[in-house]
């Protein structure tokens, strides 16, 4: 064994599937002087990888996760660690059959072979299934079982053989040292290692390790119950590790997977059970391993009964092994990847399951090497997506409790969270609530999607509102949205845009910095704006936003609620360090109203004044893309002539404390034109379609 090092280019903490594959990919990309440590023994240090069910169902409605899963499966195949056995998801009710039709669409979109089966066809592939209680199945021939421990071992050993990696098991992290906001060293029970980069890839322990550096990885260890049931005669006679397709009993949130002569039964139907990272036992104190806790039998019994109903032979066998296995859950059920927001060069590769482990390791390695990954766009997994309130334990537990039992659930793409609501309200909230707003969540903001007060407009426009006949299409939707669209197109509407994020850049190098960050030329006249993409280091598209030039050395970036965290991090990460550019997040200080429609100008002309005189709002004096500081009924505001909804109008910014006065003033001025509040269903969907920005 090598002598414990005092310096390294990169320290990877964790030797599960992610950490092992990561060191392998880093070595392949030319990284040298890598050190990998884990507090447990090798090859199984005691994390979730050691007890995982090790199967891959590639179809996912989320493109990012589907691509990462397919990339992982390719790597398992290349290493000879993939056993293709096929998989069938079975339906017990008509709603699930409808979901299978939607899954067929996703499978075709990602190039995954799949087919719908009748109960009899399911029986042909899985002869011991009770076909009388199912209505059909979703069959994916490429579903496979993998050996994640051996895969990780091969990747780790390959990096060692290349001469680029030193590995130290039974090495516990005691502290992470940070200097001037940048990671400096890892302190272990074997010594201190100075490091340029540190990656936290230690699964359920990741939050505890990150907090040593003052960083936050928002996840919780959660229980997933599983049991090995056997011996079972028909499985023993197959003389194979996996001879039959894996079955996912979707409506009971269970799965059945052959393991030689036994059947592994796993469940996501029990209550959500969380373990704090600090309460996970050590290897020495664990009967099996730190992440294999004793089964809570009462939670598992109902699920076992349902499994026996589907496969009667399970009732004649014994439970040989059963655990409350720990895995990682995040508030939005997505991985947590990328450089931490709080500490430079401290990276997260956490909340990753076996099916996407090697692919995510490749993605993170590329990200660290090139500044952005080549494999796929990691927007949904980027750690910088989280706002501060979303990283609290209260939020993490509430959201994870809500979505745990939806692991195999039928989740509508517009379905809203029930927990952790009313975290962020605009000053217009009382008026919106009085108007019967249906609120959707936008990173904690309560945003009106449509208003019950506009229901009468549905009758006015009748069939033009295009009612949706299919129940699924009509979920989390209302014809009021289309009525609001038509009303704004005829007259005028006002939209709450307070969920926008606004970042001010000031200082002598503000313009130079933004020129570097943005594609389009930001050196426009004061009082003008620029709509521009942000690119990755390789020239890929990272995002788009608007920049207002408020003064010679004062620019305001405006971006959306769902991109604000990522854009905030991206700008701050690339800012000069000598103080020539000052970044100020104005998002909690400003509120925004959009006013659009043919009568928007007439409405605002009643109440907008300049410096003690009537202000000319005409297109000649106030052209598209122009920015002006004005008074609106005495309220200091910034008006920006812009439209993403196909109608003339403005975004209007003011301080939060002036917001309610501004709303009431605009509503009163527009009463003559029957002004209405308009929801995000118009602004974010139908209006944008009509505008057709290209």
What are these regions (language model features)?
Residues 8-35:
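N-terminal Rossmann-like FAD-binding beta1-loop-alpha1 element of flavoenzymes
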Residues 27-49:
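Glycine-rich FAD pyrophosphate-binding loop
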Residues 188-243, 375, 659, 677:
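Central helical "cap/lid" subdomain
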Residues 52-125, 251-256, 260-264, 274, ...:
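Dinucleotide-binding Rossmann-like beta1-alpha1 core, especially the glycine-rich loop
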Residues 138-197:
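Helical element adjacent to the flavin cofactor pocket in flavoenzyme catalytic cores
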């Amino acid at each position: 064994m090598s002598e414990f090092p005092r310096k390294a280019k990169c320290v990877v903490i964790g030797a599960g599937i992610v950490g092992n594959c990561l060191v392998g990919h880093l070595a392949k990309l030319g990284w040298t002087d890598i050190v990998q440590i884990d507090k447990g023994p090798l090859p199984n240090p005691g994390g979730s990888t050691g007890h995982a069910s090790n199967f891959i169902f590639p179809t996912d409605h989320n493109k990012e996760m589907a691509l990462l899963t397919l990339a992982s499966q390719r790597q398992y195949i290349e290493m000879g660690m993939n056993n293709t056995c096929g998989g069938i998801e079975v339906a017990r009710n008509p709603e699930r059959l409808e979901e299978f039709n939607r899954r067929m669409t996703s499978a075709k979109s990602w190039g995954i072979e799949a087919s719908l089966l009748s109960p009899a066809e399911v029986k042909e592939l899985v002869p011991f299934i009770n076909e009388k209680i199912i209505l059909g199945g979703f069959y994916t021939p490429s579903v496979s079982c993998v050996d994640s421990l051996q895969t990780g071992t091969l990747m780790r050993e390959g990096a060692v053989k290349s001469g680029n990696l030193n590995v130290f098991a039974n090495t516990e992290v005691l502290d992470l040292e940070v200097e001037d906001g940048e990671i400096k060293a890892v302190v272990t029970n074997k010594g201190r290692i100075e490091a340029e980069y540190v990656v936290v890839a230690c699964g359920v322990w990741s939050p505890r390790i990150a907090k040593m550096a003052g960083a936050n990885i928002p996840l919780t260890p959660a229980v997933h119950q599983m049991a090995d049931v056997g011996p079972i005669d028909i499985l023993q006679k197959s003389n194979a590790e996996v001879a039959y397709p894996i079955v996912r009993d979707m409506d009971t949130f269970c799965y059945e997977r052959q393991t030689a002569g036994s059947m592994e039964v796993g469940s996501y139907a029990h209550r959500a059970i969380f373990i704090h990272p600090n309460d996970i036992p050590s290897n020495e104190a664990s009967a099996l391993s730190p992440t294999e806790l004793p089964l809570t039998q009462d939670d598992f019994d109902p699920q076992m009964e349902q499994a026996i109903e589907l496969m009667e032979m399970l009732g004649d066998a014994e439970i040989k092994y059963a655990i409350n296995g720990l895995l990682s859950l995040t508030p939005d059920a997505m991985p947590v990847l990328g450089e931490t927001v709080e500490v430079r060069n401290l990276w997260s590769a956490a909340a990753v399951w076996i099916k996407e482990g090697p692919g995510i390791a490749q993605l993170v390695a590329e990200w660290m090497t090139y500044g952005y990954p080549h494999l796929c766009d990691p927007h949904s997994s980027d750690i910088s997506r989280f706002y501060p309130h979303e990283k609290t334990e209260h939020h993490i537990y509430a959201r994870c409790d809500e979505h745990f039992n939806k692991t195999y659930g039928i989740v509508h793409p517009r379905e809203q969270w029930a927990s952790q609501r009313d975290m962020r309200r605009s000053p217009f909230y009382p008026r919106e609530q009085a108007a019967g707003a249906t609120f959707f969540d936008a990173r904690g903001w309560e945003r009106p999607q449509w208003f019950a007060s506009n229901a009468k407009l549905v009758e006015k426009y009748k069939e033009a509102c295009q009612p949706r006949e299919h129940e699924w299409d009509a979920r989390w939707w209302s014809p009021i949205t289309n009525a609001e669209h038509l009303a704004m197109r005829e007259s005028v509407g006002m939209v709450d845009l307070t969920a926008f994020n606004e970042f001010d850049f000031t200082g002598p190098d503000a313009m130079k910095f933004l020129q570097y960050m943005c594609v389009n030329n930001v050196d426009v006249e004061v009082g003008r704006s620029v709509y521009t993409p942000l690119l990755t280091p390789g020239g890929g598209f990272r995002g788009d936003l608007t920049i207002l030039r408020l003064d010679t050395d004062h620019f305001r970036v405006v971006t959306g609620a769902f991109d604000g965290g990522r854009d905030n991090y991206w700008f701050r990460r690339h800012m000069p360090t000598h103080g020539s550019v000052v970044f100020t997040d104005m998002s909690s200080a400003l509120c925004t109203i959009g006013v659009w429609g043919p009568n928007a100008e007439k409405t605002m002309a009643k109440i907008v004044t300049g410096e003690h005189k009537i202000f000319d709002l005409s297109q000649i004096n106030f052209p598209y893309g122009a920015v002006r500081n004005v008074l609106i009924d005495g309220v200091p505001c910034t008006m920006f002539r812009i439209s993403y909804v196909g109608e003339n109008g403005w975004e209007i910014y003011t301080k939060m404390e002036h917001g309610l006065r501004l709303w009431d003033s605009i509503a009163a001025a527009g009463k003559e034109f029957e002004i209405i509040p308009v929801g995000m269903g118009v602004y974010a969907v139908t209006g944008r379609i009509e505008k057709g920005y290209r």
